[in-house]
Amino acid sequence: MRKIYLTILAFLSWAAMSVASFAIDVIVVSHGQANDPFWSVAKNGVDSACKDMKIKCKYTAPGTFDMVEMAKLIDNAVSQKPKGIVITLPDAAALGKSVKA
């Protein structure tokens, strides 16, 4: 849980930077589904921060807690070459290769 909070805090800190001079797109890859009570709060926070900072964000998560699917989502996010990628990391061993990409 601590890692999740630190990830969200890091994203919000990053989002607080001035973005007026350039367009930013960010992809958030979470292991928590947006329909889960906890993760719905996190997704709403991401959406709110992105709206406030006028940046384009996309929140993605696997349909269930699935590290293989999450790795695919991370790989897909990397291939889109956004300005930023924010991830949660519930299993570093399973996601390490995708994260290093």
Label for each model-derived stretch:
Residues 7-20:
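Bacterial N-terminal signal peptides
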Residues 2-5, 21-101:
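A residue-level marker of the well-folded mature domains of exported/periplasmic proteins
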